[in-house]
A protein has these predicted regions:
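N-terminal catalytic or cofactor-binding beta/alpha core of small enzyme domains
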Residues: 1-234
Length: 234
């Protein structure tokens, strides 16, 4: 628990558990990534706005407390990008050394703790909460018009309920955009699909939730939809 944040949430979404693998850009003492703090503060270091949005939604939340550049909690051991050597055009020189201890120090406690928490609390649905940059430095020509993306792998129960509701609310919605849950879904594969818990993978565009006002607006828009999807599945 020392490297995760847990907040119990409020009654509004008490039967949902938000999981935010990339909610922090914290680099623990003793780790030298070899990059400036200014880089860590961008989308390269974390999912901007996710922690604030999780708190604003009021659901119980399990949030990673180390930067994705220290270790990517949404990948499995053995994945070449678990400890990235580069991200969106920026080399991470400190990750060229032996980093195998980061699995036992950060990855394993995060996932073991999450598994125990799910077993103890039995949430009706998980919400995998991420955010995405409007534009990648390495692909400036790529258009990312979506306000919210919905990601999933094999279990489509929650996505099929959520997508039409998001669209009906006037939200520009990407189905498996800007990433595909068929490729990037490690935490939900492990903690939801493997044990049959419904889940909703959400990617929110970062420029919409990088201010307090933006967070409040999108919590108000997404909260009722999440609650309705969860109730419809139950």
């Amino acid at each position: 628990m020392s490297d995760t944040w847990y907040t119990p949430g409020t009654a509004a979404l008490s039967n949902v558990l938000i999981v935010g693998d990339h909610a922090s850009n914290h680099v623990p003492p003793g780790i030298e990534l070899g990059i400036d703090q200014a880089v860590l503060d961008t989308h390269i270091g974390w999912d901007i706005g996710v922690a604030a949005l999780a708190w604003a939604l009021g659901a119980p939340a399990w949030l990673g407390h180390v930067s994705r550049l220290v270790i990517d909690l949404n990948r499995e051991p053995g994945d070449a990008a678990l400890v990235p050597l580069a991200s969106d055009g920026h080399e991470i020189p400190g990750n060229a050394a032996d980093t195998s201890d980061r699995i036992s120090l950060y990855w394993q406690p995060y996932h073991d703790g999450l598994a125990r928490h799910i077993a103890l609390t039995a949430p009706a649905m998980l919400v995998s909460l991420h955010s995405f940059t409007p534009r990648l430095t390495t692909r400036p020509e790529e258009q990312r018009p979506w306000e919210v993306g919905v990601l999933y792998n094999r279990d489509e129960r929650a996505p099929r309920l959520a997508i039409p509701r998001l669209e009906a609310a006037g939200i520009v919605t990407g189905d498996q955009q800007p990433y595909s849950g068929k490729l990037l879904n490690a935490s939900m594969n492990r903690h939801a699909e493997a044990i049959g818990i419904p889940y909703l993978g959400l990617e929110v565009r970062q420029d919409l939730i990088d201010t307090e006002a933006g967070v409040a607006r999108w919590a108000a828009r997404l909260g009722p939809i999440i609650a309705e999807v969860c109730a419809s599945i139950a």
